[in-house]
C-alpha cells in the first residue's frame, strides 16, 4: 500500500480490485493494475471492514494546528480515534490524551465527518483543562461550556 499524499489517495495492489471499486466510490484501477482509492475516513472504514489495514488519513493529510508539536504516540492516538468510532483511550496520565482527542475531533470536523463534538467532563476540569486545550490546541475552535445538574 502506498499513500499518495499529493492527491490524497491510496494505491493498492489487490487480487480482487472489483470488490474495492464497487464498495468505495471514486476508486479506480490503473493500466498497471494498481487500485487507486480516495484516502478518506469513509474509504478507510470500508477497507478495514474487508481486512485491508489502511492508515488513518489524519497521519498524512492534517496540519496538526497547535502551539504544541504532537509526539508520535499522540498522532497514533488521534489516528486511532478517527478510524474507530467507538473507542476508549487508556493512555497513562500526562501523555496528552486530551490534545490527541481534540486533534482527532478537529480533523473529523474539518473533513466533514462530524459537525460538533460533545465533551462531558467533571466541572473541575471542564474550563481549565478542556477549555484551555481547545483554545490553545486548535486554530479556530471555541468551546461553549454548559454546566448544570
Q: What role is predicted for each listed range?
A:
Residues 4-54:
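Interdomain "pre-motor" coupling segment immediately N-terminal to P-loop NTPase/helicase cores
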Residues 15, 19-30, 52-79, 83-86, ...:
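SF2 helicase/translocase NTPase motor core
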Residues 91:
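The Walker A (P-loop) glycine that initiates the GxxxxGKT/S ATP-binding motif of P-loop NTPases
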